[in-house]
Protein backbone atom coordinates (compact mmCIF):
# COMPACT_ATOMS: atom_id res chain seq x y z
CA UNK A 1 0.00 0.00 0.00
CA UNK A 2 2.74 2.50 0.94
CA UNK A 3 4.79 1.72 -2.20
CA UNK A 4 1.72 2.25 -4.38
CA UNK A 5 1.08 5.58 -2.66
CA UNK A 6 4.71 6.74 -3.06
CA UNK A 7 4.58 5.94 -6.79
CA UNK A 8 1.19 7.64 -7.32
CA UNK A 9 0.18 11.28 -7.82
CA UNK A 10 -1.76 11.22 -4.55
CA UNK A 11 -0.13 13.40 -1.86
CA UNK A 12 -1.83 12.20 1.35
CA UNK A 13 -1.84 8.78 3.04
CA UNK A 14 -3.45 7.78 6.34
CA UNK A 15 -1.84 4.92 8.25
CA UNK A 16 -4.25 3.96 11.01
CA UNK A 17 -4.09 1.42 13.79
CA UNK A 18 -4.85 0.91 17.43
CA UNK A 19 -2.10 0.80 20.07
CA UNK A 20 0.30 -2.10 19.59
CA UNK A 21 -0.54 -2.79 15.94
CA UNK A 22 2.94 -1.90 14.63
CA UNK A 23 2.59 1.71 13.47
CA UNK A 24 5.95 2.75 14.96
CA UNK A 25 7.74 -0.27 13.48
CA UNK A 26 6.22 0.55 10.11
CA UNK A 27 7.38 4.19 10.36
CA UNK A 28 10.96 2.97 10.80
CA UNK A 29 10.60 0.65 7.79
CA UNK A 30 9.14 3.45 5.66
CA UNK A 31 12.13 5.66 6.50
CA UNK A 32 14.59 2.87 5.63
CA UNK A 33 12.84 1.84 2.44
CA UNK A 34 12.14 5.26 0.95
CA UNK A 35 15.14 7.33 2.11
CA UNK A 36 16.58 7.41 -1.41
CA UNK A 37 13.25 8.33 -3.05
CA UNK A 38 13.17 11.79 -1.44
CA UNK A 39 15.64 14.60 -0.80
CA UNK A 40 14.58 14.49 2.84
CA UNK A 41 12.28 12.66 5.23
CA UNK A 42 10.88 14.80 8.05
CA UNK A 43 9.34 13.04 11.00
CA UNK A 44 6.98 15.03 13.23
CA UNK A 45 4.61 14.42 16.09
CA UNK A 46 1.68 16.39 17.42
CA UNK A 47 3.16 16.92 20.91
CA UNK A 48 6.58 17.22 22.53
CA UNK A 49 6.00 14.06 24.54
CA UNK A 50 5.00 12.09 21.44
CA UNK A 51 8.06 13.32 19.54
CA UNK A 52 10.38 12.31 22.39
CA UNK A 53 8.85 8.82 22.64
CA UNK A 54 9.05 8.29 18.88
CA UNK A 55 12.64 9.60 18.71
CA UNK A 56 13.69 7.14 21.42
CA UNK A 57 11.93 4.20 19.76
CA UNK A 58 13.22 4.61 16.23
CA UNK A 59 16.45 6.59 16.74
CA UNK A 60 15.58 9.22 14.14
CA UNK A 61 15.19 12.99 14.43
CA UNK A 62 11.64 14.03 15.37
CA UNK A 63 10.23 17.51 15.98
CA UNK A 64 6.80 18.77 16.89
CA UNK A 65 4.72 20.11 14.04
CA UNK A 66 4.84 23.59 15.59
CA UNK A 67 8.65 23.61 15.74
CA UNK A 68 8.87 22.42 12.14
CA UNK A 69 6.46 24.80 10.44
CA UNK A 70 6.36 28.02 12.49
CA UNK A 71 8.90 30.79 13.06
CA UNK A 72 8.63 33.41 15.79
CA UNK A 73 7.73 36.74 14.21
CA UNK A 74 6.76 39.08 17.02
CA UNK A 75 7.01 39.40 20.79
CA UNK A 76 4.72 41.88 22.49
CA UNK A 77 3.62 42.90 25.96
CA UNK A 78 -0.14 42.86 26.49
CA UNK A 79 -2.08 45.47 28.51
CA UNK A 80 -2.01 43.00 31.38
CA UNK A 81 1.81 43.03 31.36
CA UNK A 82 1.98 39.49 30.00
CA UNK A 83 4.42 38.66 27.20
CA UNK A 84 2.94 37.18 24.06
CA UNK A 85 4.85 35.55 21.20
CA UNK A 86 3.37 35.38 17.73
CA UNK A 87 4.51 32.85 15.16
CA UNK A 88 4.13 32.85 11.40
CA UNK A 89 4.26 29.97 8.98
CA UNK A 90 7.77 29.17 7.74
CA UNK A 91 8.50 29.60 4.06
CA UNK A 92 7.73 26.57 1.94
CA UNK A 93 10.81 24.55 1.04
CA UNK A 94 10.84 24.67 -2.74
CA UNK A 95 12.83 22.47 -5.11
CA UNK A 96 13.04 19.68 -2.54
CA UNK A 97 11.08 16.46 -2.43
CA UNK A 98 10.14 15.73 1.16
CA UNK A 99 8.28 12.84 2.73
CA UNK A 100 6.53 14.11 5.85
CA UNK A 101 5.49 11.50 8.41
CA UNK A 102 3.31 12.80 11.24
CA UNK A 103 2.72 10.56 14.25
CA UNK A 104 -0.15 10.90 16.74
CA UNK A 105 -2.19 12.65 14.07
CA UNK A 106 -5.45 12.22 15.96
CA UNK A 107 -4.38 15.22 18.06
CA UNK A 108 -4.08 17.57 15.07
CA UNK A 109 -7.09 19.83 14.87
CA UNK A 110 -8.44 22.30 12.38
CA UNK A 111 -10.71 24.41 14.58
CA UNK A 112 -9.46 27.75 15.87
CA UNK A 113 -9.97 28.57 19.56
CA UNK A 114 -12.47 31.22 20.61
CA UNK A 115 -11.40 34.87 21.01
CA UNK A 116 -11.50 34.45 24.80
CA UNK A 117 -9.24 31.40 24.64
CA UNK A 118 -6.84 33.22 22.31
CA UNK A 119 -6.68 36.24 24.64
CA UNK A 120 -5.38 34.00 27.44
CA UNK A 121 -2.63 32.43 25.35
CA UNK A 122 1.02 33.42 25.54
CA UNK A 123 1.73 31.86 22.14
CA UNK A 124 -0.20 32.56 18.93
CA UNK A 125 0.29 30.55 15.75
CA UNK A 126 -0.83 32.02 12.42
CA UNK A 127 -4.60 31.49 12.20
CA UNK A 128 -4.56 28.70 14.83
CA UNK A 129 -5.84 26.02 12.44
CA UNK A 130 -2.93 23.60 12.71
CA UNK A 131 -4.01 21.13 10.04
CA UNK A 132 -4.68 23.87 7.49
CA UNK A 133 -1.37 25.54 8.34
CA UNK A 134 0.54 22.27 8.00
CA UNK A 135 -0.99 21.54 4.60
CA UNK A 136 -0.19 25.09 3.42
CA UNK A 137 3.41 24.50 4.48
CA UNK A 138 3.90 20.93 3.23
CA UNK A 139 1.69 20.40 0.18
CA UNK A 140 3.63 20.83 -3.03
CA UNK A 141 4.06 18.86 -6.23
CA UNK A 142 7.14 17.02 -4.98
CA UNK A 143 6.07 16.22 -1.41
CA UNK A 144 4.14 13.34 0.15
CA UNK A 145 2.50 13.27 3.58
CA UNK A 146 1.74 10.25 5.76
CA UNK A 147 -0.52 10.86 8.74
CA UNK A 148 -0.15 8.10 11.35
CA UNK A 149 -2.46 7.55 14.28
CA UNK A 150 -5.12 5.74 16.21
CA UNK A 151 -8.63 6.75 15.12
CA UNK A 152 -9.96 5.48 18.47
CA UNK A 153 -7.98 8.07 20.45
CA UNK A 154 -9.48 11.36 21.52
CA UNK A 155 -9.51 14.00 18.83
CA UNK A 156 -7.83 17.38 19.12
CA UNK A 157 -8.98 20.04 21.57
CA UNK A 158 -11.73 22.30 20.15
CA UNK A 159 -12.83 19.72 17.58
CA UNK A 160 -16.58 19.53 18.03
CA UNK A 161 -17.23 16.62 15.71
CA UNK A 162 -16.42 12.99 16.43
CA UNK A 163 -14.27 12.86 13.35
CA UNK A 164 -10.51 13.10 13.81
CA UNK A 165 -9.70 15.55 10.98
CA UNK A 166 -6.07 14.54 10.38
CA UNK A 167 -7.02 10.87 9.99
CA UNK A 168 -10.11 11.29 7.82
CA UNK A 169 -10.13 10.71 4.08
CA UNK A 170 -13.63 12.25 3.92
CA UNK A 171 -12.56 15.38 5.82
CA UNK A 172 -9.61 15.99 3.48
CA UNK A 173 -11.84 15.54 0.43
CA UNK A 174 -14.57 17.90 1.70
CA UNK A 175 -12.46 20.60 3.41
CA UNK A 176 -9.30 20.65 1.29
CA UNK A 177 -10.38 18.96 -1.96
CA UNK A 178 -7.47 16.53 -1.57
CA UNK A 179 -7.53 12.92 -2.67
CA UNK A 180 -5.91 10.42 -0.31
CA UNK A 181 -5.27 6.75 0.36
CA UNK A 182 -5.56 4.94 3.67
CA UNK A 183 -4.68 1.68 5.32
CA UNK A 184 -5.69 0.32 8.71
CA UNK A 185 -3.45 -2.14 10.55
Residues of each region from the PLM?
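Conserved ATP-binding/catalytic motifs of P-loop helicase motor domains
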Residues: 1-185
Amino acid sequence: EISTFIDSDIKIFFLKGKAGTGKTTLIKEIINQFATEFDKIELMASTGRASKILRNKIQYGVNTIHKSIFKESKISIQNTGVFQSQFRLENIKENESILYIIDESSLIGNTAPSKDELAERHLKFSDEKLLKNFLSFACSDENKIIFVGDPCQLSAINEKNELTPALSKEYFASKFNLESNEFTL
